[in-house]
């Protein structure tokens, strides 16, 4: 992740876990902080650090094995939240004043308010506390990262189960299989123009109406394997499949 003049990386593996910042111009290490993530199961993580800018400060949020940890721009730990899976993959993100953390397959989804400090982990039987606005047990996903859009947070499992939660409260508004024939999803969903888009590994893009009720509008087929999340660049959507790179824009 880039923040100011710093390139920040997280290195969580079976031998060591640390976060480090490097000068983006020279490559010189500016600081390094070793991470204590516990000793349960795997020690490897896959989540890119997320720079959370809000009114109180700028934080570097990391999601690692078993725990999420936030740091200030000097590498000092600000807070930590237990409850992640042993090898999380989905990216955290900010939306409408809150931080959203997908703890990975089999774990919870969390919404965190700005200003947290210390250990903000939920006690047993708790679903919220002074810093965690809400949590949803077993709402975490394996590969795709969630997306927030028009008041909803959407999660997609690798097997094609789409769920929508109210962003402010965590209330589940629906949970459904997108299509009986679509059972493999690696890419993260994206949204614009009142619609949600989910691209399957088979190259089918399922277009779903944004809102509290599930409505599949149509399906676009590329007829080739797709495992990379598309990127929105200006008015274009870039989609990479097994052998092609597509640049798609709305017809004028």
Regions found by a protein language model. Give the residues of each.
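Noncatalytic, solvent-exposed loop/strand surfaces
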Residues: 1-252
């Amino acid at each position: 992740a880039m923040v100011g003049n710093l390139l920040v990386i997280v290195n969580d593996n079976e031998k060591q876990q640390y976060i480090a910042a490097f000068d983006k111009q020279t490559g010189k290490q500016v600081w390094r902080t070793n991470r204590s993530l516990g000793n349960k199961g795997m020690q490897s993580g896959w989540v890119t650090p997320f720079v959370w800018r809000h009114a109180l400060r700028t934080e570097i949020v990391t999601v690692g094995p078993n725990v999420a940890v936030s740091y200030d721009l000097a590498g000092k730990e600000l807070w930590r939240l237990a409850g992640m899976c042993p090898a999380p993959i989905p990216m955290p993100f900010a939306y409408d004043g809150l931080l959203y953390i997908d703890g990975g397959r089999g774990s919870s989804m969390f919404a965190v308010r700005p200003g947290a400090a210390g250990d903000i982990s939920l006690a047993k039987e708790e679903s919220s506390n002074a810093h965690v606005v809400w949590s949803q047990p077993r709402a975490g996903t394996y590969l795709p990262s969630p997306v927030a859009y028009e008041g909803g947070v959407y999660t997609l499992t690798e097997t094609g189960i789409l769920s929508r939660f109210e962003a402010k409260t965590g209330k589940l508004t629906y949970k459904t299989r997108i299509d009986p024939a679509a059972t493999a999803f690696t890419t993260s969903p994206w949204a614009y123009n009142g619609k949600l888009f989910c691209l399957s590994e088979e190259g089918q893009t399922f277009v779903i109406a944004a809102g509290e009720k599930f409505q599949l509008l149509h399906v676009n087929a590329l007829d080739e394997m797709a495992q990379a999340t598309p990127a929105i660049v200006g008015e274009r959507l870039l989609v990479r499949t097994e052998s092609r790179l597509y640049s798609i824009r709305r017809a004028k």
